Amino acid sequence: MVLLPEKEKRKKEGKKVHILKKFIPYYSPYKVVFFLDLICAAVISLIDLAYPQILRTMTKTIFAGSSSVILKALLPIGVALLVMYIIQGLCKYYVSYQGHMMGANMERDMRQQLFDHYEKLSFSYYDQNNSGQMMSKLVSDLFDISEMAHHGPENLFISLIKIIGSFVFLFMINRKLAVPLLVLVFFMILFSYGQNRKMQATFLDNRQKIGDINSSLQDTLAGIRVVQSFANEEIERKKFKHSNHNFLVSKDANYHCMGTFMSGNLFFQGLMYLVTLVFGGFLIAKGQMEVADLAMYALYIGIFISPIQILVELTEMMQKGLSGFRRFLAVVETEPDIVDQKDAKPLEQVQGTVDYENVSFHYSDDDTLVLSDVSFRIEAGKSVALVGPSGSGKTTICSLLPRFYDVTGGRILIDGKDIRSLTLESLRNRIGLVQQDVYLFCGSIRENIAYGKPD
């Protein structure tokens, strides 16, 4: 294990806080639902905390009285408890329904934002990134983010109320027994924190590996005709097997961390029951604790352990969600290479004269010039054919005109106007283009033919 310097640790923690700050604004359109969800979660937790205390009070007062006193008190107590649990049931319905819908709405908003941003990104981004990875971010990552958006704050809030509330009652019942339990909780938190950091790295690797599987699958299925025509099924099978195996290895590391985390927490929970029983029995023997109080202690330990188990599951969910959100941010914070200039104007009243003046170009990941100091003019209304061997730059020349890429030297003019001074939408609307690799969208033949001009 490599120990990170303290400065590096602080840097990583700062990144986590920075990511959470970027995530919080997505709650803004649903803040009313969010706060009502937390209020309902608080009511559910407080009612769970109240029942053992009500039972303890009744055991020491009403149930210690005569049978007539007990019978007289049963009806109002029963009605009060019924009302209490009806309220709890309604709150649970709101949390389960509206809380989940809040997460689903946030998932929809983020998916739309990601899709819209994909459409703005330049060709250079798609040259360097695989569509399978992009699909993984649109589907798998956003589902994990949605689960975190709903369950994260809600479960954390419920757990904190139950943990703090149960410990308050444990101290009220018997302070001596509460102290060793508090020490156990301290060590449990230290253990959980250490394991949590290890799990985060494995979840991020999982996201990457499932993206690799999607990439391999998408490549093979999209090009299945080419694969079969060259009888390359075995080659593609080996490529997919490699990606599939890497995902299994990543999952193995992930499940190892999870197993250590969950088994360790379960062990600490068992120790809490052990301490309660043994030390509680000792206090009863010394006359420092009542038997009824030990029973209440066991109930509150159960209430205390329940949110710890939720927090254990929440840790896994949060790690998946944060890993997915990092990948989401990596895309939406990527700026397109080709954008409108601030003073860009629409292309209007086109005659159609095209000038390439001393145009040079190389791709962003390679300094080798594809075009070098190319100049020519195409008069309006003329038809021109570019003829040359494969790789001579014919497609590149065509791709520069609608600004799929920007020239690295020289300039391109339409009717004397530099195409960089024009808005992208108006420029591309004036250009008809047939790609080398024809792609058919889902829909009718008519819709595909009219794709460039649906009206």
Q: Where in the sequence are the language-model features?
A:
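Juxtamembrane loop-to-helix connectors within ABC transporter transmembrane domains
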Residues: I19, Y27, V95, G99-G103, ...
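Cytosolic ends of transmembrane helices, especially the final helix of ABC transmembrane type-1 domains
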Residues: K209, N232, H256, F304-V331
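ABC-type nucleotide-binding domain
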Residues: D340-Q341, L347-D455
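An intracellular "coupling" helix at the cytosolic face of ABC transporter transmembrane type-1 domains
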Residues: V32, F123-S124, S140-A149, P153, ...
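Transmembrane helix-loop-helix hairpins at lipid-water interfaces of multipass membrane proteins
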Residues: F34-C91, F171-K176, G287-V291, I445
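A hydrophobic transmembrane-helix motif
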Residues: P52, R56, I87, P153-N196, ...
